[in-house]
Amino acid sequence: MIIRKAKMTDSSVISLLMNEAFGWEKTKPSSSLFFLNKNTTCLVAENDHGELMGSASLHLLQKINRRIGIIEDVAVFEKFRGNKIGVNLINELIKLSKNEDCYKVILNTKLDNLSYYEKLGFVSKELQMELRL
């Protein structure tokens, strides 16, 4: 397995992955701004045949006196699940967060997935509120 930074040419496969994993709109293309944002890193996991198996992204947020990493959109194609692809992607994003001097890494998840992230060292803290626009 190879973990690398996503390229703009990966966007159509990443869109398919997001559709499968999260049920996103199939007609909505990936934004090129996502790949050009200097505070965002998207990693992909690729097998030995060059197939994209999963992806995850890190968004750096500069606060007043410190920086945090936000992990988003961790997804693995169903046919590749159970091979620690998500774990490897998350661990790489955690390393990247440390290299970027983040004091913490946060993520949002469904309640069904809590134990998955707890095994990686994450703990439930606070409660996120959201207003969909």
What is each stretch, according to the model?
Residues G23-L43, S57:
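Active-site rim helix/loop that mediates acceptor-substrate recognition in acyltransferases
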Residues V87, Y103, L111-L133:
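Conserved active-site alpha-helix within GNAT-family acetyltransferase domains
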Residues V44, E51-L60, I70, A75:
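Conserved beta-strand in the GNAT
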Residues S97-T109:
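Conserved GNAT acetyl-CoA-binding A-motif
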Residues V76, G82-K95:
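Conserved acetyl-CoA-binding loop-helix of GNAT-fold acetyltransferases
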Residues M1-K28, H49:
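Short amphipathic alpha-helix that is part of the acyltransferase structural core
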Residues L61-I71, R81, K125:
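A conserved beta-turn-beta hairpin within the catalytic core of GNAT-like acetyltransferases
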